[in-house]
Amino acid sequence: MLKQRELHECHVLYNLMTDPAVFPYVRYPCQSYEEYLFITKQLIVEEEQGTCISRTILDEIGHPIGTIDLYHIHHQTGFLATWIGAPYFGKGYNQRAKEAFLAELFLGHDIETIFLKIRTQNIRSKKAVEKLPYVTLANERYEQVYQSINHSQQRYNLYCVERSDFLESIGGIQHEVAT
């Protein structure tokens, strides 16, 4: 479901990203394929430097359908950014991608807290993240971070995933599956 980013996937991902239902909500809204290719190269370099972790989201047959990134990694925290192409909306990919990525981050990297900033008008993302049992609204708990993401005219809600909450949640999920 997730794999490291590769440049040969950029054509498919760029075409999915430019859909009007997706484009306003991506972290890097590129205006051209060449710009998207450049940004992807930068992300690969940043991952090598340890400042971000970026993955391609795949469907069941291995086609790229979106991306998921942890960026601004600092003091065991980072920000999560995810987008999925419109043809794949409502099919459970978002939740599965997040769970796989969070498991990788919390079990394979030294990450304790993951922040998600969601534009107040992005109802689709808000509903999707609030379905996840390990995500909490963090506007008050992390007020300084909340203030820092709301310094422009664009308004965001801040959510977070703590390592302990996620691991407890997936332990419960795994127990339910086993019984």
Pin down the residues of each PLM region.
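A short hydrophobic/aromatic micro-motif that marks alpha-helical segments and, especially, helix-coil
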Residues: 24, 33-35, 47, 148, ...
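Acyl-donor (CoA/ACP) binding surface of acyl/acetyltransferases
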Residues: 1-11, 15-21, 58-179
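A short helix-loop-beta-strand connector motif used in the catalytic cores of GNAT acetyltransferases and
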Residues: 43-56, 66
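Conserved GNAT-fold acetyl-CoA-binding loop/helix
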Residues: 21-42
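A generic secondary-structure signal
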Residues: 42-43, 104
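Generic alpha-helix structural propensity
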Residues: 8, 17, 35-38, 52
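Sparse recognition of residues in long alpha-helices and their boundaries
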Residues: 29-30, 52, 145
